[in-house]
Amino acid sequence: MTASRIFLLFGTEEPEPVPRRLEAGRLSAELVGGNLRMIRFSGKEVLRAVSSLVRDRDWGTCEAAITELTVEEEEAATIARYDARFRAPDGAVLDCRATIEVFPDALIFDARFTPDRDFETARAGFAILHPIVGVAGRAVTVQHGDGSVERSVFPDLIEPWQPFKDIAAITYEVMPGIEAECRMIGDVFEMEDQRNWTDGSYKTYVRPLALPWPYVLKAGETVHQAVRLSIRQLDAVAVVATKPVPIEISLRRDQGKLPAIGIGLRPDEAGDELLEAGLIRVLGARHLICHFDPGAGHGAAALRHFRQMADTSGAAVTLECFVPCRRPLDDELGEIARMVGDSGLRLASLAVSPSVDRQSTPPGSAWPECPPLEDVYQAAQRAFPGVPLGGGMFSYFTELNRKRAPANRLAYVTHCTNPIVHAADDLSVMQTFEALRDVTRSVRVIYGDKPYRIGPSTIAMRQNPYGSQTKDNPSGKRIAMANRDPRHNALFGAAWTLAYAATVAEAEVEVLTLSTLAGPFGLVAGPGEPVKEGSPRPLFYVLRWLAELSGGEGIAIETCVADRVLGLGAELDGTITLLLANLTPNPETVTLAEPGRRRLLLLDEGWLRNGAREPEARPHESADVVLPAYAVARIEIL
């Protein structure tokens, strides 16, 4: 049976919803799944999204079942109406009646929510996303609930706490001569800097985080909210061109060393990891990031497994160790050190984190009882003398930004990221690279030139700091907070992996880990995937190419369309190697003026259809390279 194109690109047969364009005059928006995205005036993005969202008690998304959708296109307006039904994990139902009106200079999104019985939720209502590119650091005016006005700026570096609270309206200059006011009605709104989670937006949301959650919407009681966007044109404005432009890439040399590539190991995948241990050496990974959690029952057997994997692969070992912090720290860490010694495992480095820090502490909440990080780090250094110590967070930058590790005790700082905390659609996942640039920039401002490691970071979520569990995804859908994501297994995952490495390259990361060895976060295909079971997934080749370039003199690849194509390069032994990823479902053509003989390797749909065999370099004379949907290219210039 011939695999479908969508399956090869995304690892799933589930199509993304087709957006419905709503427009009046020069104001337009896309309606997808009952929510608005890409709200533009005269071709310029004004808001990234306006969404009517419902979260369950664990911050998981309750998907909306949309019915009775109608769209009326009138001379001066476009009006959409629909009914939505949200279902909680316990079966409770929240019904919503929504109306969206688009005028030439205004947009109104009105929603009325009514539960059939008491409905437990962490959040129910509107979320408004302002874009970050061209907006970060720009002036903004905030009107508060009491009528007072605050003149400020959108945060430049990522703000750990809410930059604005008690918001009634937000006004900013979209482009010269155009102001946009977004007014929220029906509840108390505040803003968070969603770049903390690598979302490409500032989010204004309903219900302050300082209030208790989850909370209950009472049976039969209707909650009414509305968002009103108003455009004020102060001067004549030309329409912004939105047609694709040719992508010319330029190279910037001497960008420092590219990072070593790490691979994550997990005790719950020990059996499969032993079977695939040889793949680590083939890939060229130089570090094993070994997850060790005594609270999850990890002990001597897990450490012996890590030693066996290190012996087979020849890679250096970092023990990613949760510290229970229930007994004296010297006792707990001394016991772990004895087990490590008895196992014969030699540590190249050790990273520690209090177990309670795996869960996020939202703004306004009480911090859980925990020894000071200084004490944890000192105890780790006593238990493991001479072993370089890392710290930070095993969760995400959000938690590191809010609870900053004392760097004076650390040999390096570390954190992970995840692109599907809030949204899991293809566009949002690829837009996370806009924010990832600011994540690494913020880390460098906080920690200076301290050695810096990232990962394991994958599309799927390996732990949920915001609830009791991650989301199971047996049907292979695009689900926020899912513990497996089908796109990891397909071309999309390969493109995402390269784009991640390209985005963080400027931060001169020491070790970058973007995969585990086995399982849903790993390198090896299971049944029902775009490549044959037991074969390397497409991202394996990307990571192997990155490993080949690690330690080489980095080359930055600059384009005018970083939302469409990203890449990096290095020069080794007189050969320039460039890696490029297409972040879109459309073919993209890049033009490279660099002189020299060229060879091209391409991971694309055709490569998958031909069996995903070892990619072969072929001569490529043209300065143009066509990147099919979500393709990854390796260009060698001799």
Label the predicted regions.
Residues V54-D110, E192-Q194, T198-S201:
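Extended, loop-rich substrate-binding clefts of extracytoplasmic carbohydrate-active enzymes
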Residues R48-L53, R87-D90, T171-E248, H291:
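Beta-strand-rich recognition/accessory modules
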Residues P615-L638:
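C-terminal beta-strand-rich structural cap/linker in extracellular carbohydrate-active enzymes
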Residues T2-D83, A139, A285, I289:
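Acidic-aromatic substrate-binding/catalytic surfaces of carbohydrate-active enzymes
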Residues C560-P595, L603-E605:
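Carbohydrate-binding surface patches
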Residues G264-G297, H305, M309-S313:
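Catalytic domains of carbohydrate-active enzymes, especially glycoside hydrolases
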Residues G220, I454-V542, I557-C560, V565:
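Aromatic/acidic polysaccharide-binding cleft in carbohydrate-active enzymes
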Residues D105-F189, L603-G611:
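Polysaccharide-binding surfaces and accessory modules of carbohydrate-active proteins
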